[in-house]
Amino acid sequence: EIEVGSIEELHYYEFSNALREGDVLALAKIDREDLQEEYPILIHLATPVLLTMMDRMMGGEGEPDDSLDPDYKLTDLELNLYADIITDMMAFLGRSWENYITLNFSYVRTETNPTLVQLIGYDDTVVIVGLDIRFPNSSGRLSMCLPGEMLTNIFTEISKQTGHRSTGEDKSEEIFDSLRDSDLEIIAELARTKIQLS
């Protein structure tokens, strides 16, 4: 079960400072010609939930490991599984926008030490979407960091498309008005019968 837990507008450094040295970030991008974004979308999945998902992928029960070290570092195999999980999530992320705009998200790479990498301007505005994930025996959080400039560009594109749609709607209204005002002869046959006269 997944539901939106929070949406916050922050500066990037507030998101970055909340990450620990052992945290892993997935970087994603939008594949769309008119929205070539230089800033990545950052995705952070809490390690306990991530390990539960991996265990279930490998046929396990997804039992949480209560003895997990807070500074646990993912193995190479786990990093590959992490990339697979994020790649699958990208398809669903695109579907969440499809009523407004067609966006295709794709996985770019994984950062194993995000505290040393400046991916977005330190003072840039970002929107953090927190998704609460619940399994029968585990729960945790997935956080998506969406650059404010990217969202502004997306909303601008949506506004343009809405403007084009309303123009099309105006023309269709004109067409219907001219059809209503036109003269049209209608002949209808209600029934046919045969009568014998004998």
Language-model-detected regions and their locations in the chain:
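N-terminal auxiliary interaction/assembly segments of multi-subunit proteins
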Residues: 1-198
